[in-house]
Amino acid sequence: MKSTSDLFNEIIPLGRLIYMVNQKKDRLLNNYLSPLDITATQFKVLCSIRCAGCITPVELKKVLSVDLGALTRMLDRLLCKGWIERLPNPNDKRGVLVKLTPDGAAICEQCHQRPGQDLHQELTKNLTADEVATLEYLLKKILP
């Protein structure tokens, strides 16, 4: 009898490969970011908030494709670190908006500068320049 993992790999081999590459990227990113006391997941949340300016947790959940409960806990941790603030939502008396603090913007900028080219080289070290270009082209074709 085949395991669930084996069945999953047979049904969605490309999806599994993309997932595994994403996991590798996150592990590498965590290694690069650890001296700044931030995880890859926290970095993604901060970047999404930075791009939006101010955003509701529900909108952020959709952007990141994560569970709202997990996102709320993440936002609580970022709030404790002083990297975000919660503001009343003027369009919804019960809701809030999240926004980067100056410290949050600064850590986001530091994170952008830190891994950059090193991360790209580590991810693609077994590929030729032509293979990297082809991979980027094909992945962009998959996206809408």
Swiss-Prot record:
It comes from the Bacteria. InterPro entries: HTH_MarR-typ (IPR000835), MarR/SlyA-like (IPR039422), Tscrpt_reg_MarR-type_CS (IPR023187), WH-like_DNA-bd_sf (IPR036388), WH_DNA-bd_sf (IPR036390). The keyword Nuclease does not apply. Keywords: Antibiotic resistance, DNA-binding, Repressor, Transcription, Transcription regulation. Residues 11-144 form the HTH marR-type domain. GO terms for molecular function: DNA binding; DNA-binding transcription factor activity. GO terms for biological process: regulation of DNA-templated transcription; response to antibiotic; response to stress. SUPFAM superfamilies: Winged helix' DNA-binding domain. PANTHER family: MULTIPLE ANTIBIOTIC RESISTANCE PROTEIN MARR, TRANSCRIPTIONAL REGULATOR, MARR FAMILY. This is Multiple antibiotic resistance protein MarR. It comes from Salmonella typhimurium (strain LT2 / SGSC1412 / ATCC 700720). The lineage of its organism: Bacteria, Pseudomonadati, Pseudomonadota, Gammaproteobacteria, Enterobacterales.
